[in-house]
Amino acid sequence: MLLNALASLGHKGIKTLRTFGRAGLMLFNALVGKPEFRKHAPLLVRQLYNVGVLSMLIIVVSGVFIGMVLGLQGYLVLTTYSAETSLGMLVALSLLRELGPVVAALLFAGRAGSALTAEIGLMRATEQLSSMEMMAVDPLRRVISPRFWAGVISLPLLTVIFVAVGIWGGSLVGVSWKGIDSGFFWSAMQNAVDWRMDLVNCLIKSVVFAITVTWISLFNGYDAIPTSAGISRATTRTVVHSSLAVLGLDFVLTALMFGN
């Protein structure tokens, strides 16, 4: 009984390592090589639109409402200690250090990541990738690489937008609704936030999350079983694995950045 359990555990561990190896080789083969900017630039621009611009609506709307909720809950707590003038500090630090990068990455995984997986999986199911290989076109360089760089570029920009509209949403609640003096709100935020460190750390988190989410999304699509059920399972795996990876990496990065 114990030997069977150990054998099963070892089999799963080897399978996981093999999957990581295939994912690493896919990304390496897609990115390493002679750059062809003139040929791939139109593909990159198109994917920036598909991955980034089409994700802006959910990012902006979610950012406004999360900022408003954060402003309202923060106001209710701070008024208990007669510290409601510190609401701007609370909203800005919460969004810059944690909520902005994490929530933007989770929304990006749900919207853009799942779309990338479904698109690549469908291309494999309809043998478009095999057709490219037959025509001496590297599908990794033509299909995977532009989508990867589009994700890496888009998510940090979407995170900045999320944080900006979130702070604006918090000011709507705190200043326009609850009547906090706007000077107190913005000055508390400016005094408490180290824009160089907090903004840089926010961007570092968003870049790490962008690489992770885009990599997982593309590999799950590339490795999907070429059936409708296989593509469906691959899309589900993308959202689940990306969400867990973002939350786990967030703890690691937070411990490294603010653990001292």
Curated annotation (Swiss-Prot):
Q: Does the keyword Cell inner membrane apply?
A: yes
Q: What does UniProt give as GO cellular component? A: ATP-binding cassette (ABC) transporter complex; membrane; phospholipid-translocating ATPase complex; plasma membrane
Q: Which residues lie on this side of the membrane: Periplasmic?
A: 72-88, 169-198, 260
Membrane topology is: Multi-pass membrane protein
Organism superkingdom: Bacteria
Q: Where in the cell is it found?
A: Cell inner membrane
Which residue windows are transmembrane per the record? 51-71, 89-109, 148-168, 199-219, 239-259
What does the UniProt keyword field contain? Answer: Cell inner membrane, Cell membrane, Membrane, Transmembrane, Transmembrane helix, Transport
* Effect of deleting the gene: Mutation leads to accumulation of phospholipid in the outer leaflet of the outer membrane and increased outer membrane permeability. It confers sensitivity to SDS-EDTA.
Q: Which is a GO BP term held by this UniProt record? A: phospholipid transport
Q: What does this protein do?
A: Part of the ABC transporter complex MlaFEDB, which is involved in a phospholipid transport pathway that maintains lipid asymmetry in the outer membrane by retrograde trafficking of phospholipids from the outer membrane to the inner membrane. Probably responsible for the translocation of the substrate across the membrane.
The subunit field of the Swiss-Prot or TrEMBL record says: The complex is composed of two ATP-binding proteins (MlaF), two transmembrane proteins (MlaE), two cytoplasmic solute-binding proteins (MlaB) and six periplasmic solute-binding proteins (MlaD).
- NCBIfam families assigned to the protein according to its UniProt record, in alphabetical order: MlaE family lipid ABC transporter permease subunit, perm_MlaE_1
Q: What is this protein called?
A: Intermembrane phospholipid transport system permease protein MlaE
Organism the protein comes from: Escherichia coli (strain K12)
Name of the gene: mlaE
